Amino acid sequence: MQRIDHPLLAHSLGSQKTLSSFHFGVPGQRPKVYIQASLHAEELPGMLVAHHLRPLLEKAEAAGEIKGELVLVPVANPIGLAQRLDHKPMGRFDLDSGENFNRHYPDLAQTIGPAVLKLLGADAQSNVHTVRQALREHLAQSTPSTELQSLRHTLLTLAFDADSVLDLHCDCESVLHFYTDEACWPHLAPLAHYLKAETILLAKNSSSGSFDECLSDVWCHLAEALKTNGNSAPLPQGCCTTTVELRGELDVSHALAEADAQAIFNWLKHTGVIGGPTAPEVPPPLCQPTPLAGSETVKAPSPGLVVFAAQVGDHLKVGDLVAEVIDPIANQTHRVLAGVDGVLYARIRDRFINAGGELAKIAGATPFRTGQLLGA
């Protein structure tokens, strides 16, 4: 294992943060898998999973079982990790710019597309190499000018040439669930089943500008551009990415993290990144994928106290009671009902809400939303 420390641009005088990455196997060896945790810095289950995954990787490396390359970043956001306000962690948004740490990643296909599309030929693997080389050159020539930009640039530089990228997050209160691109799902389905995901949300493009989509969408967009231009050059999905939501913010325990780390390790063996004894058989799925465009965000019609009737993991029908929002001044209770059939896969932790605030999310099977599919 090799540890590499990446100093970020200093935000102010006398203050500089460092991102640390841990490298296993041989650089450049295929397949390459990149795993990071806690890009939203207050989302800590993934950080503990990375802590438990590391000794498994060290043991595999010592036994000569790592056949590819693995990069592990257990603390993907030292900027957000240092942010607190009134004793509360503030790791989702950069307090200086107001930007979400997992948004505003670039459209790399738009950047490299005009030049790289002309270079693609009849050999699929050669085309993958050409695209990765173009991405490498673009990132090498990019010069970030802020601390936040340098964090994004460093993460992309570590991950851009990976075959698979796992971005470990969590929700407020939730079951374990997945976000991934439709093109990536076949490759990542065994991982979801090893982890016993209870909701799987698929999208072709959520238009969110998230870290994982930045890395997978470049391949989808370039392939679409080839088709639009009538170019028959083959371009496989060179990078499959997923955001794994490891339950809720308070689900930080050794028992859960050890099980999740072992599940990820089993998937690494299943994909051939790690050799040695055969991986356990992929478990049967606990759910079927549903479209992200079919996910309902249940909102509060008025301000008040929140009393949930539905628990995370409940299978709801249209009209089922999700929560009551109580106004103790007006002595009114507003019943908030499910608008779609599906699993209530996430809900808020707070028990007071403002009018229009998000209460919960239900994974419906029928698409009904368009445009930007992820919130702030």
Predicted regions and their residues:
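Structured catalytic-domain cores with a bias toward divalent-metal coordination
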Residues: 1-376
